[in-house]
Design a protein with these regions (language model features):
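Substrate/ligand-engaging "lid" and interaction regions
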Residues: 1-43, 47-528
Length: 528
């Protein structure tokens, strides 16, 4: 069983017997139509693209109500195209990892072309220019990570031959401008707040610089700034797509699926002919398009206005997912866990995040209307975090915690203040913040040192707790005033809102010798 065996819906019995869902559409017909009249180019050929946007389009094609595929362009790691796309006719196998330990297998054939987005690849770049000049093009989109939207001064000085992704995209937009100021929507699908603004700011920066350098007419800058021509909608995406998993590899090999090996590129991208991802997924997009769009709602995408996208983001980041992640990761590191899924089998930790979410954060949740916060958090606690296939580690999640506490917990505290709610309802959120002062010591609950995850403020914050020791008996905790008064870290001065002393008391308990972390966590979780 190989991906290249599948041509024009060749539904061999063996695939069906082994539980593989094959495309229900005419692959060659979709390829031909897309080549002539492309509607969508996606930048970023990584695993998240194949597991989510490409799979959503595959579902839309399977419905029989749409007939165009997506063309993928890679602007960073060109080996992905040569090794993970072209040898397999641009098809891939999506393996859906369920929290029950079961898997679902689906062949994704919605990608019709794969291109290297750089002028050094002459044919590929010429094809991209041709696509951008075609009036049929409706949308370009991105999963290139937040760093991919960066603009470097050196790149701005390279004129019309930039090397960074945003510069290349702006150069392609210039081709579209020259073809008649054709309309287009530029759509970020990366997991960062107000992602459309990041693309917009980058494109506008390049365009303005090129006008200043006399390389392009001022009308080009006006074109990318004209929202009747070019738009940059916001979106909220949520799906975990880990590296190819050895357990999944073995399951596929046992089926007789031969394309089951892992590919590691020179740039250290981990990819494969298959992609494994969690079952739960959300993609909500601001419906602000200038030239039409592919009907991705046929594959489950939610379209709404910008305010609703922002509310969904706040619901996730401030209440239903990110605070739970941070809470269990701070304590998970001190309790020597290395897997989030394993933490979910710990009664104290599981109850800890349940009560933070449902009892303390949910009274002030931002309800977006199109997604139910209770259903969202229920999926997080009951399906996503316990998923045995998800190799996510608390050590990864606590990276840069100093930059995350204000949004993940400070916003909830501020909402209690703004609404005049009783802050005595806040017990476990203060316990998270107390745990941070204990985590910064880098000593686990057995008294052994552990490696603290990278954080830009680590040295400064560790210096604050340096006088403290993990020991029984009296010690001076007055240094904590220098931590918990920091609104730049917590979003509020915790003393000014009446929580500072409560948190200090919890820190004292957490520092009271070996075993104090477990004892304190259990005490407050049970009492809550």
């Amino acid at each position: 069983m190989k991906l290249t065996d599948i041509k024009n819906g060749n539904l061999s019995a063996e695939w069906a017997e082994k539980g593989y869902e094959l495309p229900k559409f005419d692959i060659e017909a979709v390829k031909a139509k897309t080549h002539a009249e492309p509607t969508w180019v996606h930048f970023g050929a990584g695993n998240i693209f194949r597991a989510f946007p490409a799979a959503v389009l595959n579902d839309a094609l399977n419905s029989g109500e749409y007939d165009r595929g997506v063309i993928v362009a890679e602007s960073f790691d060109y080996e992905i195209i040569d090794k993970a796309y072209r040898p397999y006719d641009n098809m891939s196998l999506l393996v859906c990892l369920k929290s029950t330990g079961e898997i679902e297998k689906k062949v994704v054939a919605s990608v019709t072309e794969s291109l290297k987005a750089d002028p050094s690849f002459t044919e590929d770049w010429a094809r991209l220019v041709e696509i951008f000049q075609n009036p049929s093009l409706q949308m370009i989109s991105f999963t290139i990570t937040e760093k991919g939207y960066g603009v470097a001064p050196a790149d701005l000085e390279r004129g019309l031959t930039p090397v960074l992704a945003m510069g290349k995209v702006t150069a392609l937009l210039y081709e579209r401008f020259k073809a008649g100021k054709l309309p287009l929507t530029v759509q970020s699908m990366d997991n960062c707040s107000h992602n459309g603004d990041k693309v917009k700011n980058a494109v506008h920066t390049y365009a303005a610089k090129w006008v200043e350098q006399g390389l392009v007419p001022a009308e080009f800058l006006a074109y990318v700034q004209d929202e009747t021509k070019v738009t940059f909608p916001w979106s909220m995406i949520d799906k975990i797509t880990p590296r190819p998993d050895a357990k999944v590899q073995k399951m596929l090999a046992d089926d007789g699926f031969e394309d089951n090996y892992t590919i590691v590129t020179e740039k250290h991208t981990f990819t494969a002919p298959f992609v494994n991802a969690e079952e739960t997924q959300y993609l909500c997009i601001e419906d602000h398009y200038t030239n039409g769009r592919p009907p991705l709602e046929l594959g489950g995408v939610l379209y709404c206005d910008r305010e609703t996208v922002d509310k969904i983001e706040k619901m996730k980041v401030c209440t239903c997912l990110n605070p739970l992640h941070t809470a269990m990761s701070i304590y998970g590191c001190m309790l020597d866990y290395t897997l989030i899924s394993a933490e979910m089998a710990d009664e104290d930790l599981r109850t800890f995040i349940q009560k933070i979410g449902y009892i303390e954060a949910m009274p002030v949740v931002v309800d977006p209307g199109v997604l139910n916060p209770y259903e969202f958090i229920g999926a997080v606690i009951n399906r996503r975090l316990p998923n045995p296939f998800m190799p996510d580690a608390p050590q990864r999640i606590v990276t840069d915690t100093s930059q995350k506490l204000a949004i993940r917990f400070g916003e909830t505290i501020k909402a209690y203040e703004a609404r005049g709610l009783d802050k005595s309802n806040l017990v476990l959120i203060p316990l998270v913040l107390a745990g941070y002062a204990r985590y910064l010591k880098g000593i686990d609950d057995n008294g052994k040192a552990f490696e603290i995850s990278p954080d830009p403020m680590l040295a400064e914050l560790q210096a604050i707790v340096a006088p403290l020791e993990v020991k029984e008996g009296e010690q001076d905790f007055s240094c904590l005033k220098n931590l918990y008064s920091r609104a730049d870290i917590f979003g509020v001065d915790l003393y000014a809102v009446g929580l500072g002393e409560q948190i200090e008391g919890m820190v004292k308990e957490l520092y009271a010798g070996n075993g104090a972390v477990r004892k304190t966590l259990h005490k407050y979780v049970v009492a809550r």
